[in-house]
Regions:
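Long, small/polar-residue-biased beta-strand-and-loop interaction regions
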Residues: 2-207
């Protein structure tokens, strides 16, 4: 065999061996990834519900003067044009005034608690040593046949921490409250004449 022929045969041997190794590697790689199974969970999301409350005065069976906490900062509003104590500034012994208000869960989640708190009672027109109208008027609050507050003075109500109202309160559910203020007929102390009081009522819905 000539040197030329030897070189030619040797020249084919190496490429053939490299090709064989490449083929084996290819087969091995194909075997490792031959079967796969995959699940993609799409649309995974989360969010927050909304708890808001509206207040209305009920006049002739219809809600009026409606205000909603969604309009206020931090979901809180102050309502002054629905006078829970009736606004009668010329009461005499034996007079009574009832105001009906309605609260509605206007949010997207059920409320787990509903509470009522009374603020300080402030009086004007009182001279030193005179009886305060805060200690003379009587307040009653009823809802759904249940008496929440029974003939208590504004002063006593301020000292009561929290009145719990039946809950839960579902979305779009409403609760009506009758608030009655009475100046007892037995009042004979004329020092309360010409006095006016003011007291905040705070209604809180929680979830």
């Amino acid at each position: 065999m000539s040197d030329s022929q030897k070189r030619t045969r040797k020249g084919w041997i190496l490429p053939a061996s490299v090709a064989s190794v490449a083929l084996v590697a290819s087969l091995a790689a194909g075997t490792l990834g031959a079967y796969t199974a995959q699940i993609t969970n799409s649309g995974n999301s989360a969010g927050t519900g909304k708890l808001t409350m509206s207040e209305s005065e009920i006049v002739d069976g219809q809600p009026t003067k409606t205000e909603d906490t969604s309009k206020g900062k931090n979901n809180t509003i102050s309502v002054s044009d629905i006078n829970k104590y009736g606004g009668n500034m010329k009461m005499v012994p034996g007079d009574s005034k009832t105001t009906t208000v309605q609260f509605k869960n206007t949010g997207s989640v059920d409320a787990s608690a509903f509470t009522l708190n009374f603020g300080d009672c402030t009086v004007t027109g009182q001279d030193a040593g005179e009886q305060s109208l805060c200690d003379a008027l009587l307040v009653t609050v009823t809802t759904g046949g249940t008496t929440l507050v029974d003939n208590q003075t504004p002063t006593a109500l301020k000292d009561h921490q929290t009145f719990n109202i039946d809950a839960p309160m579902a979305v779009n559910a409403t609760k009506d409250f009758d608030i009655t203020v009475t100046l007892p007929e037995k009042i004979t102390d004329t020092s309360i004449m010409g006095q006016q009081i003011s007291q905040n009522l705070v209604w809180t819905l929680s979830a």
